[in-house]
Amino acid sequence: MADLAKIVDDLSSLTVLEAAELSKLLEEKWGVSAAAPVAVAAAAGGAGPAVVEEEKTEFDVILVEAGANKINVIKEVRAITGLGLKEAKDLVEGAPKAVKEGVNKAEAADIKKKLEDAGAKADVK
C-alpha cells in the first residue's frame, strides 16, 4: 500500500484548479458524481418541516407609561441606562420609548421588573 502521508502531502500541495481536475478524473474512474449527494440531501431537507423559527435572543425593554410615581421611574431609568438626569427625564416623559435595546431575555425581564416596581408600565419586545 502506498505511503498515506505522501498522498496527503501531494494532495495538500494541489492548486484549486488541479483539485477540481482530480475530482473530475476520480468521478469518471469510479463512476460517481460529487454533486449527487448534495442534491439528494437538499431534496430530503425540503420534505421536512418548513423553516423553523429561531428563538429570539435579543430583546428591547420599552417604557410604555411612567405612571403616577414619575420621580422613582426617572431614578430607575438613570440606574439602568446610566443617563444623566435631563436625558432620563426626557425619556420617561416621552414614553413610550425604548429604555434598553438588544439585551438578553433574563436582563430584559429584570429591567422590566425594576421599572414596574418603580411604578411604570413596561413591555419587553
From Swiss-Prot:
Tagged with keyword Zinc-finger: no
Coiled coil: none
Record GO cellular component, one term: cytosolic large ribosomal subunit
InterPro entries recorded: Ribosomal_bL12 (IPR000206), Ribosomal_bL12_C (IPR013823), Ribosomal_bL12_C/ClpS-like (IPR014719), Ribosomal_bL12_oligo (IPR008932), Ribosomal_bL12_oligo_N_sf (IPR036235)
Matches recorded under Pfam families: Ribosomal_L12 (PF00542), Ribosomal_L12_N (PF16320)
Disulphide-bridged cysteine pairs: none
Listed GO MF terms: mRNA binding; structural constituent of ribosome
SUPFAM superfamilies: ClpS-like (SSF54736), Ribosomal protein L7/12, oligomerisation (N-terminal) domain (SSF48300)
Keywords in alphabetical order: Ribonucleoprotein, Ribosomal protein
GO annotation (BP), single: translation
The UniProt record lists the keyword Kinase: no
Quaternary structure note: Homodimer. Part of the ribosomal stalk of the 50S ribosomal subunit. Forms a multimeric L10(L12)X complex, where L10 forms an elongated spine to which 2 to 4 L12 dimers bind in a sequential fashion. Binds GTP-bound translation factors.
Function: Forms part of the ribosomal stalk which helps the ribosome interact with GTP-bound translation factors. Is thus essential for accurate translation.
Matching PANTHER family: 39S RIBOSOMAL PROTEIN L12 (PTHR45987), LARGE RIBOSOMAL SUBUNIT PROTEIN BL12M (PTHR45987:SF4)
Family: Belongs to the bacterial ribosomal protein bL12 family.
Protein name: Large ribosomal subunit protein bL12
Organism: Rhizobium leguminosarum bv. trifolii (strain WSM2304)
Gene: rplL
